[in-house]
């Protein structure tokens, strides 16, 4: 469960290292989970990269520390809160994705991110 003011690790090579959630898209919602799109501000970035510090970006959540319950009864939990920076067309701004992602991203039509991921759980 991600809410406003939550810090997330960026799991791609767009240049950002950490972002802070400032808005959850999709109505008047308090919390976001895996596969939800948020608006965040870049708090830490690598120099000489496309994404700079204090840029406002869109991102999709790909890992959360909170347990996710699936319909088949399985529960899954990750070690960190992580997101991938996307553009207006929901395509990733980076060319690589680091770490495992949840299968729920495939159901929410983020197939480009799923194809870049090294492992889908």
Swiss-Prot record:
Q: Name one GO molecular function term.
A: structural constituent of ribosome
GO CC terms, sorted: chloroplast; mitochondrial large ribosomal subunit
Q: Which GO terms describe its biological process?
A: translation
Which key words tag this protein in UniProt?
Chloroplast, Plastid, Ribonucleoprotein, Ribosomal protein, RNA-binding, rRNA-binding
Q: Which InterPro entries match?
A: Ribosomal_uL14 (IPR000218), Ribosomal_uL14_bac-type (IPR005745), Ribosomal_uL14_sf (IPR036853)
Compartment(s) of residence: Plastid, Chloroplast
Tell me which family the UniProt entry assigns to this protein: Belongs to the universal ribosomal protein uL14 family.
Q: How does it assemble?
A: Part of the 50S ribosomal subunit.
What this chain does, per the record? Binds to 23S rRNA.
- Record's protein name: Large ribosomal subunit protein uL14c
Native species of this protein? Guillardia theta (Cryptophyte)
